[in-house]
Amino acid sequence: MKVLLTRAKDRNQLMSEALEQLGISYIVTPLLEIKATDTTQDQNAIAHVNSADIVIFISTNAVALASQTVKLNKHKTAQFYAVGNATFHALEELGIASLAAPPDHQQTEGLLTLPELQDLSHKKIVIVRGVGGRETLAETLIQRGASVDYWETYQRVCPLIDPRTPYQWQDAGVDTIIITSGDILRNLIKIVPKELFAWLRTCHIIVPSSRVKEQALAYGLNQVTNAKAANCKAMISALGLLI
């Protein structure tokens, strides 16, 4: 087995360490780049956060960039929520208690099962996320009685990749690819040339959710496994390995 790790720069360390412990060979090629937006200094957005009853963080990037502007641990009234385990721990490192989606369902849909998010009449909610995220969470919260604002603190872009890189993956014997978001999947499909799609279809693709699995299958990828979360433990488990 040779694994390709594709998360944004500096986000592949845990998987790298886990694979090294298991003696599994891997290559790191970030297929996503995170850039802060001008809204990190948007006083209107900051005011919404400061007056919110509930603040929901979609990712660790959302936590990192928001915390550069707002003293989140000084917020006296809001309840904080994290979609995934990594985001939960990012808040925890700032001294912020939060609620997270269930361990076996760490996506938007899992977060929406929490009893605390069922009756939201007159609640003011801010969702901290990247530009162009899904609307499912906000739409459902509004249906449950909340008013919802976004604070889009970053954007996800496809990094510049040397056209020779996909050929190097094939030559190196890559047969397993870790995909932790729909954006990374789209970027993978974008940069792999048509003549390498036969190879790509032979690779075992590990994805974080049923939604991304459906996207992968729609692209014609054949061997796709849903890890049900984007964290290291879930991905390793999906590989059929134990840390």
Regions found by a protein language model. Give the residues of each.
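Signature of uroporphyrinogen-III synthase
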Residues: 1-243
